[in-house]
Amino acid sequence: MANEQFDVTIIGSGPGGYVAAIRAGQLGLKAAIVEKDNRLGGTCTLRGCIPTKQMLMSAHVYEQMQHAADFGVQASAIQLAFGDVQKRKDKVVLKNSKGIEYLMKKNKVTVFKGTGRLALPGKVEVTDAEGKKQTLQTKNIIIATGSVVRPIPGFETDGAHVVNSDHILELKDVPKSLIVMGAGAVGVEFASVYSRFGADTTIVELLPRLVPLEDEEVSKELERSFRKRGIKSQVDTKLEKLEKTGGGVRVTGKTSKGEAVTIEAEMLLVAVGRMPYTEGLGLEGTKIKVEKGFIQVDEFQQTGEKGVYAIGDVVPTPLLAHLASKEGIVAVEHLAGRKDVRPINLRLVPNCTYCDPEVGSVGLTEAKAKELGYDVKVGKFPFSASGKARILGEEEGFVKIVSEKKYDEILGVHIIGPHATELIAEACVAMQLESTAGELGRTMHAHPTISEAVMEAAEGVHELAVHI
């Protein structure tokens, strides 16, 4: 049995784990990372953020080429080469994973391939694919094992006609028709992809609207845009039964009013969320508290066990790659004894959904702000009034700023439309620096740009937007 001594050992190499390892190396700590997959990067790099966004990009290019004539460009015989789409996706995934390997070497992080298990105090047991074990001596441990697809009883996947978000990334052909169960980020993104690739697509959502965690006006705009693109939305509906048919699947259910719903398609995508992955970690018998599957931590990501931290999808904060990365940095800086480490402000975590049109948001929705007792003022600017949006031919959507009347504090920003997932960063910076809506509106933005819509929405809080 080999013995190694580390300042910190991280279990999991996703965006939380590998970023934590890099920061540890930057601070001069001897760091190890344990990963059971053959490649580094976790769900985000291998089966999540990166491959899905690459497929979305391919779908966007395909759609743009179909509308080339709108820009005075004649293109004929445009065809989708789905096999090449998959090759491009795999190439980008591999490049990103290799990039993480390089960063581990650059920051002198030792990588162990295998499954990590806590052997407290101060040890991590690593078992490789052949069953060989070794023990790492470590002063601190960070659990960053991520999440897995949540199974739904009665809607078990088979990888053929009933698939999850992992399966649908590896399809050989585009299905003729697709039912998407769940209208969160994963559901609406894949609906956008496969609809643009030619699948007759229907989204079914239990709650009354698409992307139900977003501002209600954003949800309504997305449903309108989807309808325009031929994507059908069946909201406020609970699916109760799945049947296999000769050509695919049939799902049946009821709306909240008791109306029967039956939909048939070649394929069903079950996209109803993920659950923390803590299997085999050896948490039993420790002081680490687990509630509803999530590891409980304090503001610095510490568990109840001294020297053991947890970050990312295994803790009860939003399951977002960028949040996991920041949690990893907080954990490492805290265990390193940095005096300037600050807890994460969860009000300033951006949410991005890469459907078409894109959605980006940060902070409170209008409804939530009112519920919390704020005297709310709203500024809103449509992209239909943006010169740059007209140039792009992408005039759907708007920027909405929710502010507090007395102090002009920006409480939330909600964007649906072109480059929303990029624009939201400006809102995050403004809120982080405690900018008022007035100050944001007075900040000069270059013309013509999509970002001018943020400035105009901020001016709109005080009814001073110029171009509407």
Describe the function of each predicted region.
Residues 2-14, 174-181:
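Beta1/beta-strand and adjacent pyrophosphate-binding region of the FAD-binding site
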Residues 9-16, 20, 25-37, 43, ...:
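Flexible, glycine-rich terminal cap/loop adjacent to redox cofactors
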Residues 9-11, 116, 136-146, 181, ...:
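Short hydrophobic core segments
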Residues 17, 187-188:
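N-terminal Rossmann-fold NAD(P) dinucleotide-binding loop
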Residues 21, 25, 191, 195-196:
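Gly/Ala-rich phosphate-binding loop of Rossmann-like dinucleotide-binding domains
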